[in-house]
Amino acid sequence: MRAIVQRVKESSVSVDGKTIGEIKKGFTVLVGISKDDTIEDVKYLKKKVVNLRVFEDENGKLNKSLKDVDGELLIISQFTLYGDCRKGNRPSFIEALGGEDAKKLYLDFIDMCKEEINNVQTGEFGADMLVSIKNDGPVTLMIDSKKEF
């Protein structure tokens, strides 16, 4: 399971011109799910996301987590995180998990995040979405449950 975590001042997602999720201070998390992912990968990713210490403390150090600052989450599914661009110019997505299996793990991730974060907003799984992000920092991190990077 992979995620791009972006610290944001605000972020929103729209489908067909209608805003379906928006947050203020927190993280926008783009989530990709692979064919090899299980509930253990979901647990790993959730633990990392909610506990990442990338918000400033009173001394200006990146020392506070999303939970510490009562931050918000906007979670967006993005199978293209498993795009393999090493060969040719057209990405291959054969490592991405598709359909209902991917949707279930995505929803499990959302549910687990909701257990610890007060405001969790989401995109629409499988939809064509317009995501607006106002990066803060910018602070952008890549997380892989298989620790490939």
Swiss-Prot record:
Q: What class of enzyme is it?
A: hydrolase
Reactions catalysed, semicolon-separated, are: glycyl-tRNA(Ala) + H2O = tRNA(Ala) + glycine + H(+); a D-aminoacyl-tRNA + H2O = a tRNA + a D-alpha-amino acid + H(+)
Q: Which GO terms describe its molecular function?
A: D-tyrosyl-tRNA(Tyr) deacylase activity; Gly-tRNA(Ala) deacylase activity; Ser(Gly)-tRNA(Ala) hydrolase activity; tRNA binding
Q: Which GO terms describe its biological process?
A: D-amino acid catabolic process
Location in the cell reads: Cytoplasm
Question: Would the keyword Transferase turn up in this protein's UniProt record?
Answer: no
Q: Which CDD domains match?
A: Dtyr_deacylase (cd00563)
User: Motif Gly-cisPro motif, important for rejection of L-amino acids: which ranges?
Assistant: 137-138
| Coiled-coil region(s) | none
Q: Which Gene3D superfamilies match?
A: D-tyrosyl-tRNA(Tyr) deacylase (3.50.80.10)
- Name the predominant localization: cytoplasm
Keywords attached to this entry:
Cytoplasm, Hydrolase, RNA-binding, tRNA-binding
InterPro entries for this protein? Daa-tRNA_deacyls_DTD, DTD-like_sf
Q: Which family does it belong to?
A: Belongs to the DTD family.
Entry function:
An aminoacyl-tRNA editing enzyme that deacylates mischarged D-aminoacyl-tRNAs. Also deacylates mischarged glycyl-tRNA(Ala), protecting cells against glycine mischarging by AlaRS. Acts via tRNA-based rather than protein-based catalysis; rejects L-amino acids rather than detecting D-amino acids in the active site. By recycling D-aminoacyl-tRNA to D-amino acids and free tRNA molecules, this enzyme counteracts the toxicity associated with the formation of D-aminoacyl-tRNA entities in vivo and helps enforce protein L-homochirality.
Q: What is known of its domains?
A: A Gly-cisPro motif from one monomer fits into the active site of the other monomer to allow specific chiral rejection of L-amino acids.
* Protein name (Swiss-Prot/TrEMBL): D-aminoacyl-tRNA deacylase
Q: Which organism is it from?
A: Clostridium novyi (strain NT)
Q: What is the lineage of its organism?
A: Bacteria, Bacillati, Bacillota, Clostridia, Eubacteriales
Gene name for this UniProt entry: dtd
